[in-house]
Swiss-Prot record:
Keyword Secreted listed: yes
GO MF terms, alphabetically ordered: sterol binding
Any one annotated GO CC term: extracellular region
GO BP terms, alphabetized: intracellular cholesterol transport; sterol transport
Signal peptide per UniProt: 1-15
Keyword tRNA processing: no
Similarity comment: Belongs to the NPC2 family.
Subcellular location: Secreted
Descriptive protein name: Putative protein heh-1
One Pfam family matching this protein: E1_DerP2_DerF2
Key words, A-Z: Disulfide bond, Secreted, Signal
Disulfide pattern: 39-50, 97-103
Amino acid sequence: MKTVIFLALLGLAAAEFIEIGYKVCKSDGTVSQVKADGCELTVKDGKKVCLFKKGSRPIIQIAFKPSKDTDKLKTSVRAKVGGSAMVDFPQTNSDACTYGVKCPVSAGENQIFEQSISITENHPAGEVIQVNWQLTRPDSGKEVCIIFLAEIKE
C-alpha cells in the first residue's frame, strides 16, 4: 500500500501544470488560480480551451480561500455538451478532503484542491464542452465554482 501511495505522489510531483482560462461562477470562497496537467492549451473563438487526449488522466488544480469553517467539502464535475443540459461527470470519490484540501477547513486559509479525471474512449471528441467544477459544503453552500472550456482529442 505504501508503494502505491508513493508512486501516486511521485506522479503528482512530476506533473507539469499550466494556468488555464476559467470563470468563477457563484461561490462563497475566493479562487486565486486554476491549473491543469495534461492540458494542451489552445485558443478557439478568442477563448482558452484545454485539449485533453482520450485515454489520459489530466489533473486539475484549484487554489482557493474558503469563506467559512467546515468539516468537509464535496467535489462535483458537470459538463455541458453540445448546448444540452449539464451532465454529471462520474467520480469514484467525491470527498474533496482526499484531494489535497486540509480538513477541517478554516475560513481564509489557503487551500489547494488537486484531482485527476479519466478521459475514456467513450467521451466524444472534437467538440468544445463547458466544464463546471464545484466544491460544496454539507450545508450546500458553494466554496468553489469554476467554469472552463475543454475539448477531447483522439
